[in-house]
Amino acid sequence: MELSDYRARIDQIDRQLVELFAQRMNTAAGIAAYKKEHGLPVLDPVREREKLLDVAAQAPEDMRDYTASLYTMLFELSRCYQGRLLGSTSPLTTEIQTAIDQTPNLFPSNVSVACQGVAGAYSQLACDKLFKLPHIMYFASFEAVFAAIERGLCRYGVLPLENSTAGSVNAIYDLMMKHDFRIVRSVRLKVDHNLLVKPGTKRSDITEIYSHQQALSQCEQYLQAFPGVKVIPCENTAVAAQKVAEGDGHAAALSSRSCMKLYGLECLEAGVQDQGSNFTRFICISKNLEIYPGADRTSLMAVLPHEPGSLCRVLSRFYA
């Protein structure tokens, strides 16, 4: 047989599959109606497991895993279709609909916002991109920002989530598992690190360099040019600039130009990050879910079984 012959055969089989799939889904609709009438749940795990074992046993031995994967997906699609027909609701769907109905059309501009660090931090720069006239409250730690939202001290909080060079901010992901919050918006901020010193300090005078651990990671190659200089992590880049301003002239900070102006420092070298295209994504969190017009991103955290197909089963629900 030629390749075209095989493809023609595949086309013929696909037409049959599509017809049978439509019949299966129509039958699933009948099952949904029966379950609704008798108050039965959409998911019947015992039936699904029995069916999966049965169809896998019918397949040739070298195709059983493929058959099981195919039917696992079919079960997901069937449940999704039944749930849609039944108009199934959950606390989450109710929360989402309530948020859509109650969230105003315009994102607020003059509100209380929690940020980690001190004035000049990159979180503040991200905050200024998100809000026109924010009332910023600074906190010593990321956890304190989460706590300020939970306790109602601030309506919003701004936190760094991931960087294009250094990757995820792991401390934030760890705290996400502990706190109750919602992501309202996010913003992508270009991050340029600069070597800041007190006026008059020369490169040869530097014995210590301060910055946040993420910034140090983003400037790792650059820092190799300072053998013998002590590299000291601190709370954030603005705190690093503050320490240099209060020091004796032998320290430097990897920080922003806004910190240079704010703390009266000089820039010895600009844009010293290892990657010129260096961006950090910041999230804006709130206590309650708010969905503003134009919202087009969904963020979620999930703990899944450590087994093949567990992530696929979750993602397939979004695709369906």
Where would I find each of the regions flagged by the language model?
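Domain-level signature for soluble enzymes in the chorismate/prephenate branch of the shikimate pathway
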Residues: 1-320
